Amino acid sequence: MNFLHQYYQDIIKKKLENLNDKIQCSFEFFPPKNLDTEKKLFSSVVKLSLLKPFLFSVTYGANSGERKKTYSIVQRIHKKTGITTAPHLTCVDASLSELKEIAKFYWENGIRSIVALRGDVPNKSYQHKIYALDLVVLLKKIADFDISVAAYPEIHPESKNAQSDILNLKKKADAGANRAITQFFFNVESYLRFRDNCIKNNINIEIIPGILPIYNFEQLKKFSSMTNVSIPKWMFEMFNGLDEDLETQKIIGSNIVINIVKTLLYEGVKNFHFYTLNKSDVIYSICHMFGL
């Protein structure tokens, strides 16, 4: 990454000098499936903890086994690093009474931060009865949790339109959400328009951009298809012919993410949320470069 570091060093330094507050980051992990992936996860956790993030978060499955695994990983990460670690909590396959018991259990066991989400549908026939807004309301009734919620610069796959997403986010903010973390994106203008729209609609919480590192373009296309995230044409051109060259893909992907973060810095963004995929190498390099 030295060649990229040299190119951006002066620009970034000037930008950092103009920031009144320290730039901060948060990192998202998912529970490991086996001992080998668990070792890799905690190796990444330790590495990224050196950046002193304001938050770690751990994703969450709908069944009880996955919930217990999330709780275990959250507690172990916090014990190992001392960094605030938030479990994701979703509404899928859970009643309000079950969610209430989980939230009480979390609070009684020292967890003060939660990422409150509706959750993805397990199948096409599934009908949601409880939504993220309901969960935010429930959490605030139980205790003064610090709550992060989701936001969608390029429209949630199930939303009617962009304004519907904005109104839903405003309801969550008004109900007590402390911040919103966006779905990942590659068109920075989408995030900036969304942020402006939030301001126009009096959404008075921070809209933290979600940043996804690029390791494998085929994998990225699958992620984007599932989440309704658009990939610009120029990205397809950049990765053309590199299907078997993952090392070059990683270098190009790092450059793309660097440009996204750099542009957001110039637009006044000070907090970033990284979807780590339980890896640390690229993210650590990028964050270190920007003084995070």
Swiss-Prot record:
Biological-process GO terms, alphabetical: methionine biosynthetic process; tetrahydrofolate interconversion
Enzyme class: oxidoreductase
Ligand binding ((6S)-5-methyl-5,6,7,8-tetrahydrofolate): D120, Q183, Q219, K279
UniProt similarity note: Belongs to the methylenetetrahydrofolate reductase family.
EC number: 1.5.1.54
CDD domains named in the record: MTHFR
Binding sites annotated in the UniProt record for NADH: T59, Q183
Binding site for FAD: Y60, A62, H88, R118, G119, D120, A132, Y152, H156, D165, N168, K171, K172
Assigned keywords, A-Z: Amino-acid biosynthesis, FAD, Flavoprotein, Methionine biosynthesis, NAD, Oxidoreductase
SUPFAM superfamilies linked to this entry: FAD-linked oxidoreductase
Gene name as annotated: metF
Listed GO CC annotations: cytosol
Active site: E28 (proton donor/acceptor)
Protein's name according to its UniProt entry: 5,10-methylenetetrahydrofolate reductase
Catalytic activity from the UniProt record: (6S)-5-methyl-5,6,7,8-tetrahydrofolate + NAD(+) = (6R)-5,10-methylene-5,6,7,8-tetrahydrofolate + NADH + H(+)
Gene Ontology MF term list: FAD binding; methylenetetrahydrofolate reductase (NADH) activity
NCBIfam families documented for this protein: fadh2, PRK09432.1
Function according to Swiss-Prot or TrEMBL: Catalyzes the NADH-dependent reduction of 5,10-methylenetetrahydrofolate to 5-methyltetrahydrofolate. Is required to provide the methyl group necessary for methionine synthetase to convert homocysteine to methionine; the methyl group is given by 5-methyltetrahydrofolate.
Parts forming coiled coils: none
PANTHER family linked to this entry: METHYLENETETRAHYDROFOLATE REDUCTASE (PTHR45754), METHYLENETETRAHYDROFOLATE REDUCTASE (NADPH) (PTHR45754:SF3)
Pathway: One-carbon metabolism; tetrahydrofolate interconversion; Amino-acid biosynthesis; L-methionine biosynthesis via de novo pathway
Listed cofactors: FAD
